[in-house]
UniProtKB/Swiss-Prot annotation:
Organism per entry: Haloferax volcanii (strain ATCC 29605 / DSM 3757 / JCM 8879 / NBRC 14742 / NCIMB 2012 / VKM B-1768 / DS2) (Halobacterium volcanii)
Role according to the record: CRISPR (clustered regularly interspaced short palindromic repeat) is an adaptive immune system that provides protection against mobile genetic elements (viruses, transposable elements and conjugative plasmids). CRISPR clusters contain sequences complementary to antecedent mobile elements and target invading nucleic acids. CRISPR clusters are transcribed and processed into CRISPR RNA (crRNA). Plasmid targeted by CRISPR locus P1 transform wild-type cells very poorly. This subunit might be involved in stabilizing crRNA.
Other noteworthy facts: There are 3 CRISPR RNA loci in this organism and a single cas gene locus. A CRISPR-Cas type I-B system.
Keywords of the record: Antiviral defense, Cytoplasm, Plasmid
Residue ranges of the region described as Disordered: 263-283, 698-717
The gene coding this protein: cas8b
Disulphide bridges, residue numbers: none
Record note on disruption phenotype: Loss of the 8 Cas genes in this locus (cas1, cas2, cas3, cas4, cas5, cas6, cas7 and cas8b) leads to loss of CRISPR interference against plasmid targeted by this CRISPR locus, i.e. plasmid is not destroyed by CRISPR. Disruption of this single gene also leads to loss of CRISPR interference.
Swiss-Prot/TrEMBL GO biological process terms: defense response to virus
Acidic residues bias: start-end ranges: 701-717
Cellular component annotations (GO), alphabetically ordered: cytoplasm
InterPro entries: CRISPR-assoc_prot_Cas8b, CRISPR-assoc_prot_Cas8b/Csh1_C
A Pfam family the protein falls into: Cas_TM1802
Keyword Cytoplasm annotated: yes
Name of the featured protein: CRISPR-associated protein Cas8b
Amino acid sequence: MTGPDIDDFENALNAFWHGRPPASLEDVMALYGVLAVAESGGELYGTDSKLEPFVDDGRLVTIDIDLTGETPNVSDPKVDTLRVEDVSKLRYAHKSSGRGAKYSLTQIGSKNGNDAEGVASTILGRVRSWTTQDSVRSVTGEDGHPDGWIVEELAAVFEKGSDTLEALEEAIKALLPPDESLPTVITVRLRLDAGRLSHGEESGPRWFWPAELDVLEEAMKRYATANAADKNVESGDGISEGESVGLVTDRVERVVGTPDNPIGVFSVKHPDAQPGLRQDQSWRNYPVGADTAMLFSKGQDLVETCVLRRGGVETYALPYFAGELTPLKAQSLYGAIQSLDRESDYDDSGGSPLARVTYELRESDDETLQELAKTELRFYTITLPIGDDKNVIAEEPAAPVYWVSELADALAQTVHGPTLNPERGGFAPYDNWSLLELATEDFEESRKFGFYRIVGHQFTDSAFAYRGDDEDDDFRRVVDHRLIAGVPLDASMLFDEYLRRYHDESEGGDLPPHQIVAQQLVHLETLSRAGLLNGLDVPIEPPTMTTETETETDFDTTSLPAIREHRLESFLDRPLFEAPARRAAALAGVLVGQVSWHQESERNVGRPLDAQTKGDQLTKNSLENALTSALEKAKVYALDSEYRSDRDMLFPETVDRLLETTEDMPSAWPIEKRELQFCYVLGHAHGRRSMPVAFDLHEKEDEDDQDTEEPAESTTN
């Protein structure tokens, strides 16, 4: 078996697509159904392609039943390797994975295999279940099929608890090796008198496969469409159908009110959530044509491929192309979605469908596909809580990849710049921290990793406050949708989220890891560089940026004070700290961090100064007290410290710049509370690392000197 070719997509579009570009979620879901039709070789109901994983590697168990006598005669089942020539005879019709029996008499097990016990109980049980479905049994009634008697006979054979069914179970266990687990298909072959069939032109007994019997085709179609008009309808006559303009087709047709919706955004199951909704009249609220309802159902597996579940929410990123839908676009879209089944080098979680589809098309060898990805690729993104309650948290109907690309580029520039370069006053890169491990030597690799982080939730989650899995309305996902749509974020909101996360990380009394603050600075700087930050009078990013990490120091690394001073000057060299109040808040944080490190590391003080000065609880008055104490201790500790300067002051570079910045105490600084707190924690994170990083750079200089020393010349001849 091979995948669909471009002719399959052309035929599917001609048969089932309305002709205009996708303009709604329902359009996109119907489009995925059309792609699935092409996958099935043009079949709206049959799905031969789903048997591809079973061909050659799987087995076909056939149950022969002779219905030419007075009572059914069931032979022992036979087993053989499933071959490609068998597939068309089985008339398999797929129902989305994990949703019970499939639509056809032919049933399948797991692609990973079933043992003998599993085949006898689970797969054979699905055959039995199929014969009991009301929609299947309806072919035996007044509005049934002339050959409905065949289904009646099958129901009798597979009746639960019957001797025949139990005998079949035992026969299958005896037939199959008990320790062998293989992908398995079960079907039923019937021996019938052809003359009894309503549409038969033959006579006499012969064997019929499922694909040869019209009644099984009709039963399969009724099963597939059974719930489209009556699912959970408890009012009126229990059916919701009528005539109206179809939501997708834009033409007057028979519409149904309870179609299977792959995402579940419309349901009559919870009428309280939709005041005024009459279940039997839901077709007026959500008029979906009968064929469109089947397209929704058929495309379910493709839709499900495009979801990222994390925490208590699920985010669908459904790719499509703007403009006229051509066979080439349909084929390319199908191929990109299928690529989501493969492992990714950039996303361990297997998520981020938006990123993976984008790069599948961008990195295609076909220049036409590259151009399509650049100009016409769109995503319908929608985030909902996981569970029955399908209130939409955030939605973006036509998200381009432009702003994600801009953000990814800005993120790569940020991590390759001073912010993550200790020699230039920044923090160090760290493994296993989403925004601190991107500084690879290859800029393009960093950008690609960044793209995955942004659409995979890590960009926002690394900086924002925690939300529990039980929180349905996750504001972080709202923010993700805004960024994808290119909507700038307000700085005051960001500062509040950053400080709430800081608080989350400090529960238990411990200081948050400095990496938290470093990620928040990377986050803020990236937004600023991408033009997605509002509410500040200056940009965040440092004024001079390169895409290459500086590898050689251009300052004196033989002196610890010189290293500290250079790093402090570089840290402050950003527009954010041009405003005196912000600069002073950051410098106050630096000094408190430096003094606290000294207390903890050099004097074994059990409760250093910053343990009493929580950044997220900081007020101007409490900062004034902490700063006064830090200045006093910097003088006192200098009296007996081996790191004192010739001015009898610890960390004079910080004190000097603070006094140069302002002569006022914090209570007089013109700065908002959250802005004050964030600038302080930035400075504090730098100050806490001031001496450790200086030691590292100083030791690195010593090692470099040793490496460059030339060995003495040998005096031996």
